[in-house]
């Protein structure tokens, strides 16, 4: 029976984690054992993780677009349109690889992907989750650190080296991997007219990326390039590596709105301010000519035929991000507090304050952790030295810095019905 010696005979305990009925929301009784709601949730997570490795696959051995999208839903809130585009593009890419040796009369070209969306909207997380679903090597690169070969900075070939390292130097696995290049909007040339001066970190990098994105056999130095000139190089064919490029493209919405508005003047002109529309809605109308005007070269745009745009995250979406995903921030901090034997309780008002602050800072989901850290800093500093605290309540006033967190001890918690 799940009771402990010395305790009241009426107190029941979870047979798995040992928590009492007063420490958990629900205790479910079996014939001879009890299980709490927290252990049930943990079991569900284990089953979900196991199911993820047994995704429904087509005859090609590739997960279906619907299954890919379903797993993306577990980690990324909203962005349904972008998730559908990515799911289809990734499914087609790996289906193409599965059939590469079977039928050579028609060669299907590779479709690399461009993700356009505001900071903190989930571009990086989408790319990382895709690689995890497909169990392929994944690496990230920051376009702002890249320069043309021969200049101070990181060579484009270093991206392939990182992918090779992610594949434990298994060349065959690396050749089926995914590369995510962030901040590609920062390597746009400064105007849409070709420059007579050398642009080693802008147009020059775009030119250098073209080669590996289209498909080439790159000679990769296993120990890094410039410091070990005598080492033997590994040959990596980039033809089947999927490249996903992402960027915020600040100001692109104005270029799109200007194109849509035309050059009308006089009484019949459309004088609507583009800011009246949501940025995400405007970005969805993006055309190659807009990216060209932004500063990407035509050849680079041509290597990225699939364009997925992401929406701005509103307050409701940010609150969902804080609470719903498997690795949601509230769950992460809740687990940290559990390690101290304390339950963390964020009220709805507190979550609204956190979301509103992220919107005000224009940091999207990326800024949520920083805001949570600031709110919980003093609590996490004091808590390890406090005795008999069973629950910490963070409400709207605490989140705004106008009040101290509410520490509930055993007796107080029982009185409040927690």
Swiss-Prot record:
Gene name linked to the record: clpX
Keywords associated with the record: ATP-binding, Chaperone, Metal-binding, Nucleotide-binding, Zinc
HAMAP family: ClpX
Residues bound to Zn(2+): 14, 17, 36, 39
Subunit structure: Component of the ClpX-ClpP complex. Forms a hexameric ring that, in the presence of ATP, binds to fourteen ClpP subunits assembled into a disk-like structure with a central cavity, resembling the structure of eukaryotic proteasomes.
A Pfam family hit: zf-C4_ClpX
Source organism, top-level taxon: Bacteria
GO cellular component: HslUV protease complex
Protein species of origin: Acidiphilium cryptum (strain JF-5)
Known function: ATP-dependent specificity component of the Clp protease. It directs the protease to specific substrates. Can perform chaperone functions in the absence of ClpP.
Name this polypeptide is given: ATP-dependent Clp protease ATP-binding subunit ClpX
Start and end residues of each ClpX-type ZB domain: 2-55
Gene3D superfamilies attached to this UniProt entry: 1.10.8.60, ClpX chaperone, C4-type zinc finger domain, P-loop containing nucleotide triphosphate hydrolases
This protein's record includes keyword Transmembrane helix: no
Family according to the record: Belongs to the ClpX chaperone family.
GO biological process, one term: cell division
Residues binding ATP: 118-125
UniProt-recorded Gene Ontology molecular function terms: ATP binding; ATP hydrolysis activity; ATP-dependent protein folding chaperone; protein dimerization activity; unfolded protein binding; zinc ion binding
């Amino acid at each position: 029976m799940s009771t402990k010696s010395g305790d009241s005979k009426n107190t029941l305990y979870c047979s798995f984690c040992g928590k009492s009925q007063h420490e958990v929301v629900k205790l479910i009784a079996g014939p001879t054992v009890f299980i709490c709601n927290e252990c049930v949730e943990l079991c569900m997570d284990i089953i979900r993780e196991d199911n993820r490795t047994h995704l429904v696959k087509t005859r090609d051995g590739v997960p279906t677009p619907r299954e890919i999208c379903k797993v993306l839903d577990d980690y990324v809130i909203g962005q349904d349109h972008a998730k559908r585009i990515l799911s289809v593009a990734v499914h087609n890419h790996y289906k193409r690889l599965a059939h590469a040796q079977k039928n050579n009369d028609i060669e299907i070209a590779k479709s690399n992907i461009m993700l356009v969306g505001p900071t903190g909207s989930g571009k990086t997380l989408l790319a990382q989750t895709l690689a995890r679903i497909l169990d392929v090597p994944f690496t990230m690169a920051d376009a702002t650190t890249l320069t043309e070969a021969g200049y101070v900075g990181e060579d484009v070939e270093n991206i392939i080296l990182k992918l090779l390292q992610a594949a434990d130097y298994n060349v065959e696995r690396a050749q089926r991997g995914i590369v995510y290049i962030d901040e590609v909007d920062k390597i746009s040339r400064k105007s849409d007219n070709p420059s007579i001066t050398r642009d080693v970190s802008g147009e020059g990098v775009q030119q250098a990326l073209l080669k590996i994105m289209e498909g080439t056999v790159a000679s990769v130095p296993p120990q890094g390039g410039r410091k070990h000139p005598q080492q033997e190089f590994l040959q990596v064919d980039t033809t089947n590596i999927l490249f996903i490029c992402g960027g915020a493209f600040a100001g692109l919405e104005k270029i799109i709105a200007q194109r849509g508005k035309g050059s009308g003047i006089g009484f019949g002109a459309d004088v609507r301010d583009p800011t009246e529309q949501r940025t995400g809605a405007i970005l969805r109308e993006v055309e190659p000519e807009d990216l060209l005007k932004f500063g990407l070269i035509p050849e680079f745009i041509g290597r990225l035929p699939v364009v997925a745009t992401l929406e701005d995250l509103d307050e409701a979406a940010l609150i969902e991000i804080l609470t719903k995903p498997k690795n949601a921030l509230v769950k992460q901090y809740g687990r940290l507090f559990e390690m101290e034997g304390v339950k963390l309780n964020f009220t709805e008002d507190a979550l609204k304050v956190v979301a509103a602050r992220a919107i005000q800072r224009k940091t999207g989901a990326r800024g949520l952790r920083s805001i949570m850290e600031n709110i919980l800093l003093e609590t996490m500093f004091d808590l390890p030295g406090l005795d008999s605290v069973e629950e910490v309540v963070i409400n709207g006033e605490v989140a705004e810095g106008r009040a101290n967190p509410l520490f509930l001890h055993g007796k107080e918690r029982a009185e409040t019905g927690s």
